[in-house]
From Swiss-Prot:
PROSITE patterns: RIBOSOMAL_S9 (PS00360). HAMAP family: Ribosomal_uS9_B. The keyword Cell inner membrane does not apply. Belongs to the universal ribosomal protein uS9 family. GO terms for molecular function: RNA binding; structural constituent of ribosome. This is Small ribosomal subunit protein uS9.
Length: 130
């Protein structure tokens, strides 16, 4: 039997992740480090595992992900997006429940740019009537 491998690209904010999924026992590696070591906060680890738990595939696959750009929250979202796409490549019937949960859709929200004359994207100097 050939070594089956499923691929998915995930993006979130300014992060991009390449996810390779092979049949295994649930080991998740991000940039060559174990998931628990790479994402220090529990929320990041939970976000990464969400797509697998949605389709009860938590211990069926080994996952290797390389992610770059952005911060920890964006990287976790990018890995989740990549895992969801890889699961859809593995079995087309999983696409519907993953889409209903919102894991297939690319979250298009980005940081709003700072405008000149303002402190931040929308924060202006304090206004005084008199």
């Amino acid at each position: 039997m050939a070594n089956q491998q499923y691929y998915g690209t995930g993006r979130r904010k300014t992060s991009a992740a390449r996810v390779f999924m092979t049949p295994g026992n649930g080991n998740i590696t991000v940039n060559g480090r174990p998931l628990d070591e790479y994402f220090g906060r529990e929320t990041g680890r939970m976000i990464v595992r969400q797509a697998l738990e949605q389709v009860d595939a938590g211990d069926k696959f080994d996952i290797k992900a390389t992610v770059s750009g952005g911060g920890s929250s964006g990287q976790a979202g990018a890995v989740r997006h990549g895992i969801a796409r890889a699961l859809a490549n593995y079995d087309a019937e999983l696409k519907a429940p993953l889409r209903r949960a919102g894991f297939i859709t690319r979250d298009a929200r980005m940081v709003e740019r700072k405008k000149i004359g303002l402190h931040k994207a929308r924060r202006a100097t304090q206004f005084s009537k008199r």
